[in-house]
């Protein structure tokens, strides 16, 4: 049933757009490279800010708004190739990305069948940038069992 979990995948992608697991990375230039008006010399290090790219209004209108429809099949085609990087890209892309997405879809769909989650009132949501991006104060949630008929 994984192919039928399209909306679940859209929700997960939008969550990773707003809160990418890896919020940035560095790359060392193996040759001189021109980046706009700037020259990065061989051996120089560039920081790639996934967090910033994911919240850039040029790529994602109303970037602070949670909108899974950004990732419906038609809309997703409009996202530039390197504007969505929750697992990195290119030769160093995370080799576990397909497995991680499959696992996330199964977990989210299974749990969401039985529970609704709401953020606890007044609980601050503040990302903390360490090696990975995580909630500084955790995520206090209220779980409510779904009524099944």
PLM feature spans:
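C-terminal helix/juxtamembrane-tail motif
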Residues: 138-149
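Cytochrome P450 heme-binding "Cys pocket" and the immediately downstream C-terminal segment
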Residues: 98-134
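Conserved, non-catalytic sequence blocks in retroelement Pol enzymes and Pol-derived host proteins
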Residues: 1-6, 94-96, 129-131
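Conserved cytochrome P450 K-helix E-x-x-R motif and the immediately C-terminal K′/meander segment
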Residues: 1-36, 57
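Conserved cytochrome P450 K-helix/beta-meander segment immediately N-terminal to the heme-binding cysteine loop
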Residues: 2, 48-76
């Amino acid at each position: 049933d994984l192919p039928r979990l399209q909306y679940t995948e859209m929700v997960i992608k939008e969550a990773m757009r707003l809160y990418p697991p890896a919020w940035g990375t560095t790359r060392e230039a193996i040759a001189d490279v021109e980046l706009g008006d700037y020259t990065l010399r061989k051996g120089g290090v560039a920081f790639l800010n996934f967090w910033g790219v994911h919240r850039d209004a040029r790529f994602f209108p109303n970037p602070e708004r949670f909108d899974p429809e950004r990732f419906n099949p038609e809309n997703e085609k409009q996202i530039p190739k390197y504007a969505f990087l929750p697992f990195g890209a290119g030769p160093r892309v995370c080799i576990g990305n397909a497995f991680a997405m499959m696992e996330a879809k199964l977990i989210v769909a299974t749990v969401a069948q039985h529970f609704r989650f709401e953020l606890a009132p007044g609980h601050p949501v503040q990302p903390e940038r360490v090696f990975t991006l995580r909630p500084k104060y955790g995520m206090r949630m209220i779980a409510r069992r779904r009524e099944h008929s």
